[in-house]
From Swiss-Prot:
Gene Ontology BP terms: division septum assembly; FtsZ-dependent cytokinesis; septin ring assembly
Gene3D superfamilies recorded: 6.10.250.790
Gene of this entry: zapA
Organism: Bacillus licheniformis (strain ATCC 14580 / DSM 13 / JCM 2505 / CCUG 7422 / NBRC 12200 / NCIMB 9375 / NCTC 10341 / NRRL NRS-1264 / Gibson 46)
Entry-linked InterPro entries: Bac_CellDiv_Activator, Cell_div_ZapA-like, Cell_div_ZapA-like_sf, Cell_div_ZapA_firmicutes
Keywords annotated in UniProt: Cell cycle, Cell division, Coiled coil, Cytoplasm, Septation
Function (record text): Activator of cell division through the inhibition of FtsZ GTPase activity, therefore promoting FtsZ assembly into bundles of protofilaments necessary for the formation of the division Z ring. It is recruited early at mid-cell but it is not essential for cell division.
Subcellular location as annotated: Cytoplasm
Superkingdom: Bacteria
Subunit structure and binding partners: Homodimer. Interacts with FtsZ.
Family statement: Belongs to the ZapA family. Type 2 subfamily.
Protein name stated in the entry: Cell division protein ZapA
Coiled-coil stretches noted in the UniProt entry, renumbered to this chain: 60-85
Lineage: Bacteria, Bacillati, Bacillota, Bacilli, Bacillales
């Protein structure tokens, strides 16, 4: 959001309600929550005996891993573009 106002919305992640506040639109925050929920469910399918805390930490580790891979790919692509200029 560009006007400096905070947006507040309630989301459901892994069966729990969370109220989140941020600078982005409600739809963006819901999308983020949906990705977290999906990732938690995906990990839980492979590791059904994890308690909720371990599941949350493992989800965070996986999401950050994915983020870093994408960031590295972005830097690689930027380097390729720069070489062509």
């Amino acid at each position: 959001m560009s006007d400096g106002q905070k947006t507040k919305t309630t989301v459901d992640i892994y069966g729990q309600q969370f109220t989140i506040v941020g600078d982005e639109s409600k739809s963006h925050m819901r999308h983020v929550a949906s990705i977290v929920d999906d990732k938690m469910r995906e990990i839980n399918e492979k590791n059904p005996y994890l308690d909720i805390n371990k599941l949350a930490v493992l989800t965070a580790v996986n999401v950050v891993h994915d983020y870093l891979k994408l960031k590295e790919e972005l830097e690689r692509l930027k380097g390729q573009i720069k070489e062509k200029d």
